[in-house]
A protein has these predicted regions:
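Bacterial N-terminal signal peptides
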Residues: 7-15
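N-terminal leader/targeting segments and the immediately adjacent pre-domain N-terminus
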Residues: 19-121, 149-152, 385-391
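Structured C-terminal helix/loop/strand segments within mature extracytoplasmic catalytic/sensor domains
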Residues: 21-40, 348-391
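Active-site SXXK
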Residues: 106, 127-154, 178, 233-237, ...
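Active-site-proximal alpha-helical segments within enzyme catalytic domains
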Residues: 229-236, 276-300, 355-372
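Active-site Gly/Thr loop motif
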Residues: 260-263, 313-366
Length: 391
């Protein structure tokens, strides 16, 4: 009997230790996020990394937009089936999903935010939330406006007029090459790492072109996903606007899109050195407003609408180098395209942790999720939802 009792006590102690271990915050180094293959992080770990990720760039010089005096209005018609809402709520109780918005035919039809016991005490409708890779797609949209405003001649223009890239593989790259992440830089760059080991996110364009890319020639023009091309694109806009990037993004995001609050992009140092980073912070509703503006632009007979269609028509295959969202098969102007099983015309913005904003131009639908981990069934809540409007 004593032996059995001892085994039971030992078992309780071990299970208690295992439980305590499971409730600890797990980290992956100073600047690391939760790896997506680490499938089931506990709530403390998710909350810790959400707060850490959302504080990125706070010490840097910031490129802000001002709130619009006449923000674009949002119409609500929350009438989706209860079982659909129940599925979203269930995922919000057990995964890294924080916010879910669906927009159809001019109205927000789903609007769900994480409950207070999960993330709802950390975020509300006015909280500026951070996304890195969605900033790549925003850069593609801003390039279109730079063309339409006359700062850049066309998609076929080269970067040869920019002194900072002289003597590098970027000198002969076209704007089209750049926004399709196909400048032939794969020998020197993989994801966010340079061949020297330096991280792109810590560097200016001037620093990279002076060191790693000095006297380089482009390789085969194929898709190579990284932060570098979108950083180059944003800083090329800065160069073409006389290094008045803040003024330019205000003309687009405040005046054209009609953001209700601020949008922030990061960068530190002298603007002419190429300091602007392809990330942004904005509220969940303002991020949706960007998607709505892109949808409306596509449906308009305007310069920016035609630009978006040209970009989509000239998309490139990701091939075997399919990194980024891991689902789409093609890339167009820093937007993900050609999602498996979806025949509609869809362009997507995608970020770390399951942050996604997909636009279905055929069905006039947008699905926008914010999350800290992609363990919420992306296939159903994003891909099936953008295709069918339900899941």
């Amino acid at each position: 009997m004593k032996k059995i009792l001892g085994i039971l006590i030992l078992g309780l102690l071990l299970s208690g230790n295992a439980y305590a271990e499971s409730e600890k915050v797990k980290t992956w180094g100073k600047n690391s996020q939760i790896p997506e293959e680490y499938y089931n992080p506990n709530l403390k770990t998710l909350r810790y990394h959400f707060l850490k990720y959302n504080k990125r760039g706070e010490s840097q010089k910031k490129f802000y937009t001002k709130p619009s005096s006449q923000p674009s209005s949002l119409k609500f018609n929350l009438q989706k089936e209860p079982k659909i809402i129940k599925k979203i709520s269930k995922k919000m109780q057990s995964t890294g999903l924080i916010s879910y918005l669906m927009y159809e035919n001019g109205e927000i039809v789903i609007d769900q935010l994480s409950p207070p016991e999960r993330f709802g005490d950390l975020i509300d409708n006015d909280t500026m939330i951070y996304s890195m890779s969605m900033g790549k797609s925003l850069g593609g949209y801003l390039i279109g406006h730079a063309i339409c405003k006359g700062y850049i001649n066309s998609l076929s223009s080269t970067l040869a007029d920019w002194p900072i890239v002289k003597g590098t593989l970027l000198e002969t790259a076209t704007v089209q090459d750049l926004i399709n992440a196909s400048t032939g830089d794969q020998k020197y760059i993989w994801n966010n790492q340079l061949d020297s080991g330096r991280d792109i996110g810590d560097l200016t364009i001037a620093s990279i072109t002076k060191k790693e890319l000095a006297n380089t020639k482009p390789g085969k023009k194929r898709f190579n996903y990284s932060q570098f091309s979108p950083n180059v694109a944003l800083n090329y806009i800065s160069f073409k606007t006389g290094h008045k990037f803040s003024s330019f993004i205000n003309s687009v995001l405040k005046d054209h899109v009609g953001l209700a609050g601020k949008l922030r992009m990061n960068g530190t140092g002298v603007e002419s050195k190429g300091v602007i980073q392809s990330n942004f912070k904005a509220s969940r509703y303002d991020t949706l407003r960007i998607g709505i503006a892109i949808l409306n632009d596509w449906n308009s007979d305007t310069c920016i609408g035609n630009y978006l269609k040209d970009v989509y028509a000239n998309r490139v295959s990701k091939g075997v180098y399919n990194v980024g969202d891991g689902y789409s098969q093609s890339y167009a102007g820093f937007f993900h395209t050609n999602y498996p099983g979806i025949s509609d015309t869809v362009m997507g913005m995608d970020g770390y942790g399951g942050v996604a904003l997909l636009i279905n131009f055929d069905d006039n639908r947008i699905v926008y999720t914010h999350a800290v981990h992609r363990n919420y069934n992306y296939n159903s809540l994003v891909l099936k939802a953008i295709d069918k409007g339900k899941f």
